[in-house]
Amino acid sequence: MAEKEEAIFRSAEMALVQFYIPQEISRDSAYTLGQLGLVQFRDLNSKVRAFQRTFVNEIRRLDNVERQYRYFYSLLKKHDIKLYEGDTDKYLDGSGELYVPPSGSVIDDYVRNASYLEERLIQMEDATDQIEVQKNDLEQYRFILQSGDEFFLKGDNTDSTSYMDEDMIDANGENIAAAIGASVNYVTGVIARDKVATLEQILWRVLRGNLFFKTVEIEQPVYDVKTREYKHKNAFIVFSHGDLIIKRIRKIAESLDANLYDVDSSNEGRSQQLAKVNKNLSDLYTVLKTTSTTLESELYAIAKELDSWFQDVTREKAIFEILNKSNYDTNRKILIAEGWIPRDELATLQARLGEMIARLGIDVPSIIQVLDTNHTPPTFHRTNKFTAGFQSICDCYGIAQYREINAGLPTIVTFPFMFAIMFGDMGHGFLMTLAALSLVLNEKKINKMKRGEIFDMAFTGRYIILLMGVFSMYTGFLYNDIFSKTMTIFKSGWKWPDHWKKGESITATSVGTYPIGLDWAWHGTENALLFSNSYKMKLSILMGFIHMTYSYFFSLANHLYFNSMIDIIGNFIPGLLFMQGIFGYLSVCIVYKWAVDWVKDGKPAPGLLNMLINMFLSPGTIDDELYPHQAKVQVFLLLMALVCIPWLLLVKPLHFKFTHKKKSHEPLPSTEADASSEDLEAQQLISAMDADDAEEEEVGSGSHGEDFGDIMIHQVIHTIEFCLNCVSHTASYLRLWALSLAHAQLSSVLWTMTIQIAFGFRGFVGVFMTVALFAMWFALTCAVLVLMEGTSAMLHSLRLHWVESMSKFFVGEGLPYEPFAFEYKDMEVAVASASSSASS
């Protein structure tokens, strides 16, 4: 077997393969390909509506089964029953033994079993709900009966309102009905607590105040089966005269969803009613317990198998969706499918299908052939758990064009390094490294956990965070900065005077060179900020120039690979001369200025900003000469940059105008030329597929379908963008200096305002203040300086890669490689997704 291509510098070489699958093994073949996870199928029926495709009925049937399984899962959640998740590795491991899929009869059993269980569970749920309604009704009835004395005796322990003549009602303890009169009637019931005031107000207006209204709060909330919520309710009684008025009261109460009950006014009658209600409740409790036990037993049995059923059904549905992308040869009863696969995986594909055929015990000819095609293949970069995060950073911006240089490879180093320039602090980098190491060392355990969106994002980028922390420790070492303090590792290159007075300004004398990084003697000096600002600002320009230059040379590698000499001559060379003639020259001047001992020469260091401005505004005029013949060099570079603009603008369009000839391009054959005559129907199908493909996309390289005007407009836009971007992108790298300065200053302020204050106390107070302020300092350091500042620096580094770097070479118009592969489907995610789809 040939060694696999690394496919990290450039995308893997892809092959378009065609499958001739006998109908009897089409399902097994699709299962094998799904487990292998290497083939990205092309839709050969893109013009056929979904409901007109061959296997639409099978997909609808499995959709219904998925709905039923989601219903089962919702019942498990409702009854707090945990779903048993079995071993899913057998479905996902493409390198292990072949997974034997469930047969068609087993899938049919799944369908029948799902329908049977759904019907049975619905019946038990309905029965439980009905019993629950009856139970709630009887419990409310019992509460009213138990509150009879409170209702029928006038007391101070209930809320009551009388709109009748107070002379009709005697002192406490007298029966209200007897006091009001023999003709009085009453209505008792239970109503939601938030509707009590509404009921009372409506009755007062309708009956013109001719009523006596009393309520008692039910302490325990009542479960509402319809809304699946607990509600607070009140029991009430309304006294009034006349049967007609009582009927009106009942209608008003029922319109407000009140439950009305018949309550005897005598103590003996209420006692008999209460005994009967208690007996009925006892019977209901027994029935409800039995029904609930039966329902939970069913659900526990379902919980053990539901995940396995769901995985099998979702895979079966995915199989039919893939088969729906194939064409069917009715004459030979075969399915014809096409798909993209990495060319170095062809042997693996043939071997796996051969194993499947041997397992099935059938004898069929080779069912795979590689097609010559002019279609644009998808872009596939091989990644591992370390490189996947960096690759996803670039893929979020755009998918690389097929076989162009992958921006994700250099990003592995440059992304954390650019971050570290802005975040450079050994202490903060160490905290970030510790956090990332905890994720890396426990990745197997965490990988099996259900993770929230934010934590999953951090876990996926754990290696990115690890490198950001390590690089930050490195740049922090160069900056000599650890929690805003310095480290005196080496002997300083500066010597302070031996004798000085407090408040006196003193000047250090240079006695050597600090071995590596910034000298700790600069810390705390008056001109420390001036020095670090100048150093970091120039460093940012140099880092930006280097980053953009090597990115620009990637475009040369792409032009050479695609054999596009006109892009080299018309785009790369003038662009390189323009960028190097201005910003390359500035970078060389920065390094040269650092290398010269201006104090020894006895003259001030020239300002580079004024030099660059005067280079354009006053060519040939030099205020402070940096080096001999500077004026001539700058005039030459300026003229070279000016020549590069029309060069960049005109060469490629003029080359197109004088050399381009319209040619008729015929589509490449998609089948072998020596096909036998008995394959006529298959050839017709393939020809139809090629015709559809020709309409779907314009393929091939070159400028097919473009005219001189299109090329000219494109080149004008490219020239303007390139010239402006050289300026704006170089200035954009100054964010490296700005964020590094802000991070260092914020770290210093935080130290000064918290833990440094604690060092001024002594004794027990000093210990307490040190502990308290250290906790405050550490919490703010982690929350603000590491998390917030780290996120900000990461986003700025992301911007520098997406815009400033990748714009120099990255086309980003590729197609993503999305092979057909079985994935583990989480039930909770599936239910949430279905709910959101239904709501939208």
Swiss-Prot record:
Post-translational modification as stated in the protein's UniProt record: Glycosylated.
Positions where N-acetylalanine occurs in the chain: 2
GO biological process: cellular hyperosmotic response; cellular response to alkaline pH; polyphosphate metabolic process; protein localization to vacuolar membrane; protein-containing complex assembly; proton transmembrane transport; vacuolar acidification
One Pfam family it belongs to: V_ATPase_I
Effect of residue 803 to F: Reduces assembly of V-ATPase complexes
Single annotated GO MF: phosphatidylinositol-3,5-bisphosphate binding
UniProt topological domain (Cytoplasmic) ranges: 2-404, 443-456, 555-572, 657-719, 805-840
Keywords for this protein: Acetylation, Coiled coil, Glycoprotein, Hydrogen ion transport, Ion transport, Membrane, Transmembrane, Transmembrane helix, Transport, Vacuole
Coiled coil location: 117-145
Segments crossing the lipid bilayer: 405-423, 426-442, 457-486, 535-554, 573-593, 637-656, 720-744, 766-804
Membrane topology: Multi-pass membrane protein
GO cellular component: fungal-type vacuole; fungal-type vacuole membrane; membrane raft; vacuolar proton-transporting V-type ATPase complex; vacuolar proton-transporting V-type ATPase, V0 domain
Major localisation: membrane
Family of the protein in this entry: Belongs to the V-ATPase 116 kDa subunit family.
Role: Subunit of the V0 complex of vacuolar(H+)-ATPase (V-ATPase), a multisubunit enzyme composed of a peripheral complex (V1) that hydrolyzes ATP and a membrane integral complex (V0) that translocates protons. V-ATPase is responsible for acidifying and maintaining the pH of intracellular compartments. Is present only in vacuolar V-ATPase complexes; enzymes containing this subunit have a 4-fold higher ratio of proton transport to ATP hydrolysis than complexes containing the Golgi/endosomal isoform and undergo reversible dissociation of V1 and V0 in response to glucose depletion.
Remaining remarks: Present with 55714 molecules/cell in log phase SD medium.
Assembly information from the UniProt record: V-ATPase is a heteromultimeric enzyme composed of a peripheral catalytic V1 complex (components A to H) attached to an integral membrane V0 proton pore complex (components: a, c, c', c'', d, e, f and VOA1).
Protein name listed in UniProt: V-type proton ATPase subunit a, vacuolar isoform
The organism's taxonomic lineage, starting at the top: Eukaryota, Fungi, Dikarya, Ascomycota, Saccharomycotina
